[in-house]
Structures are given as structure tokens and as C-alpha cells.
């Protein structure tokens, strides 16, 4: 597996297209546990978006976004659940270039190494933030695109298997609660 050490900035480009005509109504947030979610879910059905969303940034499928002040808790995600949406202007948005498989980068963002690297690059004393430049300066070991795809697919398969097992465990727990309730009425 041929690898080379490069920097994330060699493989991504910042996006900042705005919702100028307010045509996109799907306001999204990035959660550290669920990735992109509709803002109404993040804030329990409260409307926190501005009435004027013309300055909000447009994100499309496979684009990434993060809140610079919340990345230290894992609030960075790739859009996979919607075709497009808009995020607050404070978010930093970017996409991968053709030489980086988005899923590979997505899994890298879940790694301990990534969190160690962002800790080195946070700026500010009270509210520590990661700039786009700070993200771009993080080293990244890049195999060929074909190997990236293989790694991404394998990790996705494992994630699906884990989800199935979790779902099965929840089913067994519900059955147990039901039986306990029936037995000890």
C-alpha cells in the first residue's frame, strides 16, 4: 500500500456559496453524535435560524461542515442524509477534491489521531477554535484512491454490522422488559 504524508489542505477546498435567494429552506446543524441533522431536531423544535437565511452557507451531499468553536468535541460531519441544506454562516464548509475519497476523510475525522492533531491547532483562550487553515495544516497519510475506497467500504460494512447488533440488543432488552412486566405484574 503506497502511502505518502500530505496535509488535509492538499485534498480539500473550502466552499462558501450563500443561500442568496433563500431558496433552500432545509436548515441544518452538526451534532457531535449524529452528524448533520435538521436544526429543529438539534434544538428541540425551537427555531434558532435567522428569519433571513440569505447569508447561510449551502452544503451539498458529501460536503463537510464544522463549527470552529465545537470541533474539539467532534462537531464535524459529512452530509449524507440530505441532498442539500444550509448551515449558519459561522460554519466552515468544504469538500474533498477528486484525489480524496470523502468516506476515507470522514472516518479519519473519527480517529484519535485527528482529535490529537486538532488539539495542537486550536486557537483562543476562552473559546478555542479551529480555523480552516488549522484544519488544512493537519498531516494525513494518503493511500491511493482505490485503497481509500476499499478502507471506506470496509469500515462502512463494519459500521452497518455494529448498528445491526445494537438494534438486535435493543430488541432483546425490550423483550426482557416485556417479560419482566408480564411475570411480575
Labelled PLM ranges:
Residues 1-21, 137, 141, 145-146:
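Non-catalytic DNA-recognition/assembly elements of restriction-modification systems
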Residues 1-6, 142-185:
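Amphipathic alpha-helical coiled-coil/heptad-repeat segments
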Residues 9-20, 28-61, 87:
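Sequence-specific dsDNA recognition surfaces
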Residues 54-112:
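A short beta-sheet element
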Residues 69, 85-90, 123-146:
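A short glycine-rich beta-alpha junction/loop motif
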Residues 114-117:
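Periplasmic-binding protein-like
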Amino acid at each position: 500500500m503506497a502511502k505518502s504524508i500530505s496535509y488535509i489542505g492538499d485534498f480539500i477546498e473550502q466552499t462558501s456559496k450563500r443561500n442568496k435567494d433563500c431558496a433552500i429552506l432545509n436548515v441544518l446543524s452538526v451534532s457531535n453524535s449524529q452528524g448533520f441533522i435538521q436544526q429543529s431536531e438539534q434544538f428541540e423544535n425551537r427555531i434558532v435560524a435567522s428569519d433571513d437565511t440569505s447569508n447561510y452557507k449551502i452544503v451539498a451531499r458529501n460536503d463537510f461542515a464544522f463549527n470552529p468553536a465545537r470541533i474539539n468535541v467532534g462537531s464535524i460531519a459529512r452530509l449524507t442524509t440530505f441532498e442539500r441544506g444550509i448551515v449558519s454562516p459561522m460554519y466552515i464548509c468544504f469538500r474533498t477534491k477528486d484525489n480524496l475519497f470523502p468516506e476515507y476523510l470522514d472516518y479519519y475525522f473519527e480517529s484519535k489521531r485527528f482529535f490529537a492533531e486538532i488539539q495542537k491547532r486550536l486557537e483562543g483562550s476562552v473559546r478555542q477554535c479551529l480555523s480552516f487553515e488549522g484544519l488544512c495544516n493537519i498531516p494525513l497519510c494518503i493511500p491511493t484512491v482505490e485503497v481509500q475506497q476499499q478502507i471506506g467500504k470496509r469500515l462502512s460494512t463494519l459500521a452497518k454490522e455494529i448498528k445491526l447488533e445494537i438494534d438486535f440488543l435493543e430488541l432483546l432488552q425490550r423483550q426482557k422488559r416485556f417479560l419482566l412486566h408480564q411475570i411480575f405484574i
